[in-house]
Amino acid sequence: MKKLNLFSLFLFCLSSFLPAQTTQQQPEKTPPPAARSGQEQLQKEPQGQAKPPTEKEHKITPEEATDLFRWVDQILRFASQDTGLPIKHSVKKAMVSREEVETYIGDKFKDDVDRIRFERSELVLKKFGLLPRQFNLHDFLIKLLGEQVAGYYDEKKKIINLLDWVALDMQKPVMAHELTHALQDQSFDLDKMTKKDEEIEKRGPEDPNALIKIDEQSTARTAIMEGQAMIVFADFVLNTMDGGDSCDGDAPCPIPDKRSVVDFPKFVDLMLGQMDKEKGDSLLDNAPLLLREELIFPYTRGMKFISQLLIKGGKQLAFTKVMQRMPTTSREILQPEEYLAGRVVPPLLLPDFSFLKNDFEPFDAGAVGQLDVSILLKQYTEEAVADRLSPEWRGGSYYAVGRKGAKPGDPNSTAHVGLIYVSKWASDQAAQEFAKIYASSLPERYKKVEHGTATVAGRDKYLTADGPVHIQQNGNLVIAVESFEDGVAEKLIQAVWTQQQQSQQAAAK
């Protein structure tokens, strides 16, 4: 499924990684929205704006900004030494106000293809039950970024942007993170890296397999970008937590690079564990499970992935070679041993569904990766079951179509959206278990769910307010077809099953 790329942002929630004595108390926030909804708070507060502080906050003075800017080159050198990525030119810097950040976020939301695709997927995510029906994704994301952004690197203008309301003692670690993005950009051109994906996103779901191919690649790539930056952030904290960046005189002193997460491997786990414990009253903390997991994934699991590459192959593997041979699935990020062994799960492509075009039009399509499956399982079963079953994932994709001429009175209605979801598993037993869990989710997703009569082996049929739901398990494959008439559902299932049989036969030759 499409993940939201936060444009090389550093989030306030990541500051929980900093030693407690080095962070200033942030202003108290207004009461949180209900878990998994976030809607009540959005209705009560101004929408599309960063949340104003509830107590007076310190603004960086011109003198403090000048002093911070003098550290940029020094911290850039530290990041270069830490990663092995060369400095090809200096990095421009700016101190921006809350109003300027609001403008930047607003402008990004006008035409950012990641955001446009994410919002196009909103109704499908609601059909999967991963977002509440009344949830307003656009307003939530604008408010979330207004609340959470603590610094960002603009890859188009090549500028690191510091925020004038962020505490002084957070600014240097944020710089270390964002300057890593600048180094990535200088060596690998971040803007060019995403151009092809943007072109595919703009074309929309007319070619569903094109979207399926790039979804997981984009997720993995973002995890690499943020994981590398988080490692530099961690190494900076390790080297300065005892005052290692303090010295006499006006000029910034050299930052020691004697400590690394390689030497303190448990430090990464400590940081991640601390973040798991730091549940507060922010929008992110109380967001739907899908958003919490997917927005934090690149930072947390990306950091863990890069730390494992550092241990196995040093800086060259963790910061250069991985950019030349990117992981292509969230599975490789979640299980670094899969990447290191060169084991890749290919995209699960869908057959030609052109027979739908008389009555339906393309609505959305994408991959359903191991991360997505893990979230889906956590939503509908115990976390321990999700942790055990999700590694058995071996591929997944979905295709959604809209019924032509449908004009639902409720904009959150999904009855006019037909959904085909295919998932592949390591064994028949894993597929069977997933099919049962997926079926058990239907009462939480649809109204008026009744168990119908199925006449095909391995199939369950359900009647819902959104129309019939067919769940077919054939071996290690699970096919869910939702909101289609029975005859159309049968054609869809047969098309998927025939294609998968042909793929298996071709692979066996």
Regions found by a protein language model. Give the residues of each.
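Hydrophobic/aromatic side chains embedded in well-ordered alpha-helices
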Residues: 15, 171-175, 421
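Short pre-active-site segment immediately N-terminal to the catalytic Zn-binding motif
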Residues: 146, 158-176, 216-221
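Soluble, non-membrane globular domain cores that form compact, hydrophobic packing
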Residues: 28-87, 98-113, 164-165, 179-419, ...
